[in-house]
Amino acid sequence: MVSSTLLVMSISLFLGLSILLVVHGKDFNQDIDITWGDGRGNILNNGTLLNLGLDQSSGSGFQSKAEYLYGKVDMQIKLVPGNSAGTVTTFYLKSQGLTWDEIDFEFLGNVSGDPYIVHTNVYTQGKGDREQQFYLWFDPTAAFHNYSILWNPSHIVFYIDGKPIREFKNLEVLGVAYPKNQPMRMYGSLWNADDWATRGGLVKTNWSQGPFVASFMNYNSENACVWSIVNGTTTTSPCSPGDSTSSSSSSTSEWFSQRGMDSSSKKVLRWVQRKFMVYNYCKDKKRFSNGLPVECTAKNKNTKS
């Protein structure tokens, strides 16, 4: 009973503190290129706000000017309000080429009153199929919320308002590919995916509710390692703790050398997954009838991460 009480107190304290998280953002004009949408994406308010639009003709999207090899990136997002069924808003990291790496946040719209689903995935060398989905436990359309990706040599962690919701560990020792050699850009987009996004495609986009708008602010890449090209030559080594390619050596050391989550973070992770997870590829034996992926059966339990 005492241990249960302490667990509740610990989680409550962690959740309360995470609300105080402050993200210092950059100027979108300096850090972001709007890459598609024919004017449906706009940078406003002296570079502090970016809106993406979607109508029946097209969605819109952007990418970071810089590429990163490892980092912690944050974005505050306010999702499409009202009947957003069929729409997908994204925030993700992705490399180039046919054997790309990718770390995804995708927010699946729904009919008014139903909760949003956040869809996460990790691609390595062009292969994904590592989906985990969660209901959001708040209204993501009423205010901006902070979404973060931590990617270092040991693990990848997805955060919402400072709370870890998923961890993908480096299990190369077991033959599981891990993103480590390909620099990634940060991307965001708003697009129509009514063939699959809402109830497996059963609910279609109601275009009379459009145009749809998702808003982004406070992009923070201060703790990301910029992949640099000097005199036409690509720097092939990632930054390490204290490297000048990151703007803050002390904070770089903290996230770069992190080998796993501490006990309090693990408790919050378990709480989120127990309460809000709606799909986990590591539990889908029907889909993987010939055996679950290696990381799902590893002793260090990537199954719940």
Curated annotation (Swiss-Prot):
Modification after translation (UniProt): Contains at least one intrachain disulfide bond essential for its enzymatic activity.
InterPro entries: Beta-glucanase/XTH (IPR044791), ConA-like_dom_sf (IPR013320), GH16 (IPR000757), GH16_AS (IPR008263), XET_C (IPR010713), XTH (IPR016455)
Site (Important for catalytic activity) location in chain: 104
Domain GH16: from-to ranges: 26-216
Chain positions recorded as xyloglucan binding sites: 106, 119-121, 129-131, 195-196, 200, 287
Disulfide bond annotation, renumbered to this chain: 225-239, 282-296
Glycosylated residue positions: 46, 110, 146, 206, 231
Principal location class: secreted
Active-site residues, record numbering mapped to chain: 102 (nucleophile), 106 (proton donor)
Low complexity bias spans: 236-253
Molecular function terms from GO: hydrolase activity, hydrolyzing O-glycosyl compounds; polysaccharide binding; xyloglucan:xyloglucosyl transferase activity
Family, per entry: Belongs to the glycosyl hydrolase 16 family. XTH group 2 subfamily.
Protein name: Probable xyloglucan endotransglucosylase/hydrolase protein 21
